[in-house]
Amino acid sequence: MTRTDGDTWDLATSVGSTATGVAAMRALATRQPDPLIDDPYADALVKAVGLEHCIALADGETCVEGDPMLDLNRMCEQIAVRTRYFDELFIAAGADGVRQAVILASGLDTRAYRLDWPAGTVVFEVDQPQVIEFKTRTLADLGAQPTAERRTVAVDLRDDWPAALRDAGFDPAEPTAWIAEGLLIYLPAEAQDRLLDNITALSAPGSRLATEHMDHRILAEGAGKRIGEWSRRVGSSLDIADLFYTGERNTAGDYLRGLGWQVTVRPSKEAYADHGFELPEEMAELSGDSGYLSAHLK
């Protein structure tokens, strides 16, 4: 499925289905011995969406052999490391007194329910209306209760989401912790720049931001093809690589530095090692100069 201007989705189609796949890996990671992350709602959310290949992933029943890039355990480690990185951004910001958090393209993210937020924290979740409605209803049916004040902002990030965020009670005069997890790869180059411009315009001094540091050259080369192969082999009807926007673009880190942010990049290999994992050499070669990015606005 090739992307088009104005395309929409729910959690079983297009970009939305990738959020379900990531939640499936979080469910599997949560059941590992001595788990790096704990997402007690991921499994139920995946099953509620009902995509068979994602349910099989969550249950650990998918077997893809013969390629370290396609190994289920490796994919589980990757999502666990990624999830933990963004968890820690929010935890550190809260410890420093930040009481406003924004999750962009929140999908099946349950941090508003599973993290131990400081008293007085408001968490804003921004995503497509049908995605927000499904998750809110399903978690309510499960009896889940947010651990912070949760406010939903049902808007497409290609529309005027800053206005919708302010209408939901967001205060740009207060420092904010932002995450854009697994998002930039699905945006055209100019939309990525516009997103970072908007985040900056809404950020008071003391704000934090975390996202991926992507080597976008790899998507047009080997990695994009391999990711597409993996999605087909686990039973998806989508070629995930068709959802990516490839081509030349500003790196998020350089662009944010130009906007006045102090940027730190944690290479993937080091992020793995932080938690006792080893990034396979072939994955390291395919991922290129990729990792995780955190930024602080002084």
From Swiss-Prot:
GO terms for biological process: methylation. Pfam families: LCM. S-adenosyl-L-methionine binds at D127, D156, L157. The keyword Methyltransferase applies. InterPro entries: Ppm1/Ppm2/Tcmp, SAM-dependent_MTases_sf, SAM_mthyl_Trfase_ML2640-like. It comes from the Bacteria. One of its GO terms (molecular function) is methyltransferase activity. Its EC number is 2.1.1.-. Gene3D superfamilies: Vaccinia Virus protein VP39 (3.40.50.150). Keywords: Methyltransferase, S-adenosyl-L-methionine, Transferase. Exhibits S-adenosyl-L-methionine-dependent methyltransferase activity. Belongs to the UPF0677 family. This is Putative S-adenosyl-L-methionine-dependent methyltransferase MSMEG_1480/MSMEI_1444. It comes from Mycolicibacterium smegmatis (strain ATCC 700084 / mc(2)155) (Mycobacterium smegmatis).
